[in-house]
Amino acid sequence: MNNGDSNRETDSTTRSDQSNLRESPTRSPSSEQCSMVATTSRKREWAYGGRGTMASLAKESQENFQYMAEELEKMGNQFFGYVTGQSVKPSSAYISDVIILRDIQLRDQCLDVLREYGRSRRNGLFGFSEEGDHIHVIHDCSYTNRSCRDIWLGQVKPFGTVQKTGKPVKYIWEFKRTDWYDVFIYFFIRKRGERAIYIRGESGKIPSNDECVRWAREFKEREMVSSSDCTDYYECEQQEHKISRRSDAGSTNGRLYEKKTYSAGKFAYIRQKTKALLRKYYVSPISAICDVPEFRDDDLLCDPKNRDYIQAACEDFGKDLNAMSLREIYNLLTEDYNFTDDKELNPYAQFISSMKYDNLEGSLNIVNELLKYQCNDDEDLIVEFLTNLVNVLDRRIPKLNAFLIISPPSGGKNFFFDMIFGLLLSYGQLGQANRHNLFAFQEAPNKRVLLWNEPNYESSLTDTIKMMFGGDPYTVRVKNRMDAHVKRTPVIILTNNTVPFMYELAFSDRIIQYKWNAAPFLKDYELKPHPMTFFLLLSKYNITF
């Protein structure tokens, strides 16, 4: 953490300055000297404390050090509590990396990936600080075989390259508390972009912008910690003498960041083209866009080397849908087009899937007939059914996040809801949650809606299912990956049999239940209802969405 050469130079400079001040007490001070000797001794000593570390500051002034240490402990009590506590493994390594973004427009997506990973990391420390076109990442690591294999390294590949700091890896046992002070100051006080700390998956406290400004004002903290955590090409200190030195040497590039950054170019094109095709064909599942002829005719999109870019673009499109309400999805699919005209479909919504859809008129007739049959031809019951369904799908009611239909086989449950899954597109299926299936819920993260068909679960998972049906955040196991965080995602449950959560009191406010009957007349229909029929149905019964 500490730069020994820098510290020695700073210490000698400091002693020289102190000697000069003591030997010339009667000299008329300049305005700069006045600013150094004004007010309290704490500020006076710090002003000429130079470009040191907390360890060197402790040697210069215990009073100054103690005051600053107290302030740091207040701002980063969770951080220091972990790195100096009993739960951290001394044999773990401290790793510091820099993500150099290919384009600044990719920054927010990269930060989302890092936040998601931080929340899913169930052990250790993970933190990042963003500075425009690059992002610093720190974490502790088992460092097996002297290498880091954390999965976030692969997750950020579509957004840029990861560079090491160039400094030898240090282990936790080598750090003193003053070293951790330097780390915290450098990454979470001096940096003013997006910052985050995660400790065992929980978000930790970081200094607010006001606290950072107060820190800088109180301690003149512009050059406190060395830039030793930066890469050789990616130094973050705005040091004018370095720029001028390069210019004096005849360099044609006077910029501080000498490493040439990549333009968005290739990835930007792939992302834009892939998302445009997804809007045009609206395939289900999203990954099936690779089977569309227009996609396969594009040499760049079909290049195996670009597989990671394609996957990132598909995930990004899915996340776009996850954040949309039903109204926003309706607007996406009906831009400048009245889809009630069944002679043609919106060119941005061709709904390619493995099944064949009926036309809009035929779809509306059969779906309406099914609802009348299941609701005993009672229009009020149909309105209630559709209203409750929209409330769940749009997350309108707190703690109400599940919609269940129980019926004998051939009741039309899947016939009806396939229409909705084709509309929302980004959906996941939950499996049978028992001791033989540890990854039953691995499709839950980053989805617009979840389907649980014929649910079955062990009692040990009751609390997790309560959180799922109540819209609370929870984590799930994912095969060959870290545990994943799941935000509120509506759950559709279709079953032929009674399940414990249908009658347990704890679930009564978390789930809406309907009982349907067998619908034998559906066997005469070979085609599935068109997804856009759902919006026609809502309009027919004046349901607000």
Swiss-Prot record:
Gene Ontology cellular component list: host cell nucleus
Motif (RCR-2): 134-136
Subcellular location: Host nucleus
Domain SF3 helicase span(s) in chain numbering: 346-545
Cofactor binding, per record: The endonuclease active site can probably bind other divalent cations.
Region Disordered, annotated ranges: 1-39
Pfam families linked: Parvo_NS1 (PF01057)
Basic and acidic residues bias spans: 1-14
Lineage top rank: taxon: Viruses
Domain notes: In the N-terminus, the endonuclease region is involved in binding to the origin of replication. In the middle, there are the ATPase and helicase activities. The C-terminus probably contains a transactivation domain.
Family assignment from sequence similarity: Belongs to the parvoviruses initiator protein NS1 family.
Function noted in UniProt: Multifunctional protein which displays endonuclease and helicase activities required for initiating and directing viral DNA replication. Also plays a role in viral packaging and transactivation of several promoters. Binds site-specifically to 2-3 approximate tandem copies within the origins of replication (Ori), unwinds this hairpin region and nicks one DNA strand thereby initiating the rolling circle replication (RCR).
Entry protein name: Initiator protein NS1
